Amino acid sequence: MSEEMVPGSQFKSLVEQDMQDCYLRYSMSVIVARALPDARDGFKPVHRRVMYSMHKLGVVPNKGTVKSARIVGDVIGKYHPHGDVAVYDTLARMAQDFSLRYPLVFGQGNFGSIDGDSPAAMRYTEAKMNNLGALMLEDLEKETVDMGPNYDESLEEPLVLPSALPNMIVNGTSGIAVGMATNMAPHNLREVGAAIHALAENPDLTGEDLMEYVKGPDFPTGAIVCGRSGIREAYLTGHGRVRVRARTEIETDAKGKPRIIVTEIPYMVNKAELCKKIADLVRDKRIDGITDIRDESSRDIRIVIELRRDAVGEVVLNNLFKYTQLQTTFSIYNLALVNNLPKLLTLKDLLQVYIDHRLDVITRATQFDLKKAAARLHIIEGLRIATQNIDEVVKIIRQSKTTEIAKQSLQDRFSLDEIQSQAIVDMRLAQLVGLNIEKLEAEYNELIATVADLKDILEKRERRVAIMLQKLDAVVDKYGDERRTTIGEAIDDSDDEDLIAEEEQVITLSKEGYIRRLPIDTFKAQNRGGKGIIGAGLKDEDNVEQIFTASTHSYLLVFTNKGRVYWTKVYRLPEGARNGKGRPIVNFVALTEGEKVQAIVPVRKFGGYFCLVFATKKGIINKMDLTLFSRPRKAGVNAISLDEDDELVKVQLVGMSAEEYEASKNASDDDSAEAVENAAEAQAAEAAIAEESESGDAEDFANRPIPKDLLMIATKNGQAVTFPISCFRAMGRGTHGVKGITLAEGDEVISLLWLKAGNKILTITEKGYGKRSEPGSYRVTRRGSKGVRNLNVTDKIGAAVFVESVADDYDLIITSKDGQVIRIKAADIRLTGRNAQGVKAITLRDGDVVKDATALPSVEDIEQDSADAKETFDKVKGVEVDDDSVVKDDAEKQEIGPTETEE
């Protein structure tokens, strides 16, 4: 029997699609069911299952400990069918007072140490829940949380715990998923309790307000957090970095020799490795002045570093901070599951999620109590009827031949239901006769009041809030303690920028969203040909999207397709190696779902005669003074207001003369006046055309000087409109803009160009054709007109996919949909007239089309652009930048990040 052979390309496509689908399912499984905690209880599934298993086993605070192996076996067998090592590590970590600010498990035996010692084997250690751990499961039996089936659907397990303790915030967490990670700092219970109190009573409080209550992280190992800027950024944006220093003291011994005493070390630092590192640095003579190091720790940490008599303690200590983990950077990234989806959470978000969860738990517990009280009240009402008619009830029961007949007779006679009649017949006759009427009435009245009270709780949110806060106060009063970590001043009270030399950098952004920076000197030795430094390190299917120069002190304005703008500093970007691809830009700006970077504008100073010009897909343009963007916000702001079906295409930073700048600011909004002005410009341009045409020097006409303030909007279907920047007024940030071009049906804007002297207009089509045209051949027209033809679009060449102003020595990279890539010189594409179709720039396979293209400047152009920008901005008197909402990251040698892994 013959089999149909699947073509190789089709088989490859099927395999690729199947692998993508499988990996996506695996990724979501890791994210949702393994690596990220639920924002409500702060637990990953393995933590939750360990706690629930201990609850079901009865390994509770008022009972004795049991072997850890028994707990681990129960967890694996019933709820978590993975390796025992991951489960035991989780159990052990919840018992370590140097890992958790508020441990949830009481461990008996060797559960590891801050020196990196592993816990003893699970057959030797014993454990049970402590009182704080029991709080996590309080009211679980009252149906306060949703339950779900275990892995084989033989049992049920909670999908979240009631969490009377705000575990997520006070204990923090860490974890590495697929493509994302979380690392949350622990906090002080008293401070968190006060913040929850304040937010529950006043939901309008801002993150700034809440920082009055939560001062900063409170690590179990104490130490000192240097500066509040990183804390502020983390609390307001969900991610930030804090510098943590060991608590040290310089003292003099009895012989007059100085020594350094370390009493607290940064969180998650291995003490034994720290001492070894110091010893290695002394041996390698990288640190001078140390004669001995001793670890005298017992229950508390005490590291003694003996110094030479002539050593300066402060200098030695500063070197230790510089080269060892006596100083670290803790990276905060508050990523957790909200409604089963990963979300980056600010301080207010963390507190609000917990408040909402606790209110839901209290609501469900109240509903459970109400249901139980109502059921009991229903029975008591039946018994009251029985006591009021005791003789008749006894008579009915005695005369009935069976229990069912007696029940039915009671129901018919006294209008009882099945439950009430069953309660009466279940009582012995002697009990019924001797029923204490007063006791029954007292219980009845009490139940009436209880039911009314429970209903009132369900109806009034303020009562549920009061109950939540009352329970929280009890927890804080009993288990709250003093802060261990001190929040100190920033080191030297200097900005990171003051510690970073101002150097020229080349920044590249790839089409896949990877960004990096390289010193401009890196490019000076670049040889011609090949992929070059600019593209080195990128994947074959990735290419450079944008390349520009900037100072390490420059701001980058990152604009997205949704019209938002984000700020970051150049020095925060990774300084990549020649063959490095950089890091995803989402690590530096908090892009929302569906956002894509459309343009990055480097700004050295917010001042001078500079404007930002925006163009959208639907032909809207806007112009804004650069100084409007001098108040950076890490969370981003709306730069331009977009229609529902529109998106931002391009942003250009445009410099103008003082006269042009003032004309731009004062341009009239009167459409008719504007039309007259534009018509006059067009007429003057046409007169110039006629005059030059009469001279017969067409080449001179095409190469005539171009005014430096001209903009061009290019569309997919080959139209282009060219107009002066000054013909429309600058607007405020967040405004909609005005019509830049009238689009035909089905057409859209693909590019915005600032025409530069000496450059040519390069156009690439989807069928692989390209052409270069002189800017002077494009007639200046009225803004908002249909423009002139840039490209004669036909089935042969296809629509335009790329239009840019380029110099002759630019490199052009063209990428097709099927992954074909070609790199050519821009000058290799023939210079033609404006209406020409162009020449074939890339030969495509059948069915393939050009996906995109990128124009890369030469090394000389990069260096010249850098020099020009520096010269221009050096003359600018910049406005003061409000950096209050952008906290500068620490340029540190090390970051403390996620380390915990679970199977």
Swiss-Prot record:
It catalyses: ATP-dependent breakage, passage and rejoining of double-stranded DNA. InterPro entries: GyrA, GyrA/parC_rep, Gyrase/topoIV_suA_C, Topo_IIA-like_dom_sf, Topo_IIA_A/C_ab, Topo_IIA_A_a_sf, Topo_IIA_dom_A, Type_II_DNA_Topoisomerases. Residues 881-895 have a biased composition (Basic and acidic residues). Disulfide bonds: none annotated. Residues 881-903 are annotated as: Disordered. One of its GO terms (molecular function) is DNA binding. CDD domains: TOP4c. Its EC number is 5.6.2.2. Residues 36-499 form the Topo IIA-type catalytic domain. It comes from the Bacteria. It is an enzyme of class 5 (isomerase). Few gyrases are as efficient as E.coli at forming negative supercoils. Not all organisms have 2 type II topoisomerases; in organisms with a single type II topoisomerase this enzyme also has to decatenate newly replicated chromosomes. Heterotetramer, composed of two GyrA and two GyrB chains. In the heterotetramer, GyrA contains the active site tyrosine that forms a transient covalent intermediate with DNA, while GyrB binds cofactors and catalyzes ATP hydrolysis. Belongs to the type II topoisomerase GyrA/ParC subunit family. A type II topoisomerase that negatively supercoils closed circular double-stranded (ds) DNA in an ATP-dependent manner to modulate DNA topology and maintain chromosomes in an underwound state. Negative supercoiling favors strand separation, and DNA replication, transcription, recombination and repair, all of which involve strand separation. Also able to catalyze the interconversion of other topological isomers of dsDNA rings, including catenanes and knotted rings. Type II topoisomerases break and join 2 DNA strands simultaneously in an ATP-dependent manner. This is DNA gyrase subunit A.
